[in-house]
Amino acid sequence: MAHRLPDRIPTIMDARDEVKDALMEYYAVDSFDKVLEILGAEEMYRFKTDEIVKLHFPGFEEQAERIDGPWMGGGQKYVRLDESTFQDAWGVVRRIGSDGKFVEWVSGPLVDASDPDEYDFPGVDRIIADPDLPDRIRSWKERGLFVRGVVSQPYKTAWILRGMENFLMDYILNRPFVEKLYDKIYALQGEILRICTAAGADLIGFDGDIATQNSVVMGPDRWREVDKPRLAAVVRSCRKINPEVHIFIHSDGDIREILPDLIEIGFGVIDPIQPECMDPEEVKREFGDRITLHRCGSLQRTLPFGTPEECRQEARRLVEGCGIDGGLVLGASNTVSFDVPVENIAAWYEAVRDYDLGSLPDQSR
């Protein structure tokens, strides 16, 4: 992130539990930490922000129970509606798919609302921050961990509450609804990020897709009108607390048309550079002096369907094309799922680990 050629290319991994188990078996070790040590990689999220900066939802705890499963969000508390359907603390209903591995969105509390005020949206007074958070972050840093505080992308929070089709139509037909809902979301998410920044997080940011593989989902002009100024205000407020804090955004899809805007706001870490719709080497050439490319491995082509040698070739190509002068954190472009052969994962990450960076020119010197 300092845009200097490092001693090695940092690598990061986010993987489903089934994949972690398969890698442990492949390397004949008894913990995923040992897998990471072998690969020279870090885990994407060791501690989730919502586990250390929580929200109070009156009455939820009394009704909720822990529901386990291999799907995203498994192992947390929900209100069970039937054998496969449950409601979270926000009032969002989801259903476990027939294979038991994924969940689908069913409904949200604002689906039929005419005004966001019809929903009891949590304000900043409902934030429950760990008073020992600064000490915890300090201890993590002393262990050599890079600490990030990341909240849900406000667009993602909004569509989950409202329904995606409804909320996208609101951008066109009911802009006041969008503006009012966003004001509530940004006030809450911004305060959580300010808490993380003040506590000493190295990086803060937003996690949630705002693009398809063709374009920004609400359109770049609408994003600039509605989303950009609000994102900019949150970034400014965090930078007032710590001017050196790194600013991160995660969105799958093609966000190249708004990359200059994100850079202008202050986003310096872009995750991922999804190779199916953005060429990492082109992004590096055009924007690489201003951003860090964070995860670029193909999860639609090479990792699930390539050979181990093709995985090695992709990894080496990314190091050679994007690693000059630093500004690169490599990894699969999203969560590694059970459709990826373990041999391919090992080949990809080992190729990055074993690459001799001495052959790359350091243009920062």
Feature names for model-found ranges:
Residues 22-70:
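Segments that shape or occlude catalytic/ligand-binding pockets
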Residues 68-75, 128:
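Extended, Lys/Arg-enriched charged tracts that mediate electrostatic binding to polyanionic substrates
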Residues 1-30, 34, 87, 93-96, ...:
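Active-site loop segments of alpha/beta catalytic cores
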Residues 105:
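Catalytic and substrate-binding clefts that recognize carbohydrates or anionic sugar/phosphate headgroups
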Residues 57, 89-90:
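Structural motif
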